[in-house]
Amino acid sequence: SRGLGDVYKRQVVLTFIMMLGFYILLRAFGISAWLAGLGGVIWAFSSYFFILIPAGHIWKFVTLAYIPPTIAGVVLAYRKKYLLGGIVTALFIALQIQSNHIQMSYYFMFVILFFVGAYFEDAYKKKELPHFFKASGVLALAAVVGVCINISNLYHTYEYSKETMRGKSELKQELSLIHISEPTRHLRI
């Protein structure tokens, strides 16, 4: 059946994207090509990713696939490969945001902040703060480019979120306070 073939093709492409992304990350860390290839296969074939696809979390899967190469861009920039690091970071931030799973990208920002903090400490100890600030500037520009490429998508997602159940809370403050102050009031014991 044609429909089943399309599903298998999509899973193969998604798995390849996952492998390639992790391969790029391992290469940025200086791992040899064959070990990076093996690492990419092991990463892509971990069970969690294959649970996401049949569960219908395709865009979460794709967003997660673009996180390792985004980290690779950050690593490259702080290893004084400013242009390559900036391009890789901008490209994969743009692809991450295009995947439209903003929640995963938001959580990923905290990982990046941790990396930046670690690189700052390292640069401070080595007295290489000018290099740190140059790399950070390149990465900030890359982030702006990645976001600006998707500004229309982000705006429409923001507008749409106001109309969904994930928009504003339906809880009323007075109701919440009643439940907090008298949690057993409605229980029949």
List the model feature ranges, each with a label.
Residues 189:
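Cytosolic catalytic cores of cyclic-nucleotide second-messenger enzymes
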Residues 11-12, 132:
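A generic secondary-structure micro-motif detector
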Residues 125-134:
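Membrane-interfacial, low-structure loops and terminal tails that flank and connect transmembrane helices
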Residues 3-8, 179-186:
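Short, small-residue-biased leader/transition segments that mark boundaries at the very start
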Residues 16-29, 33-122, 135-157:
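Membrane-embedded helix bundles of polyisoprenyl
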Residues 157-177:
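Extracytoplasmic catalytic-loop and juxtamembrane helix elements of membrane-embedded
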Residues 10-11, 59:
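Alpha-helical transmembrane segments of multi-pass integral membrane proteins
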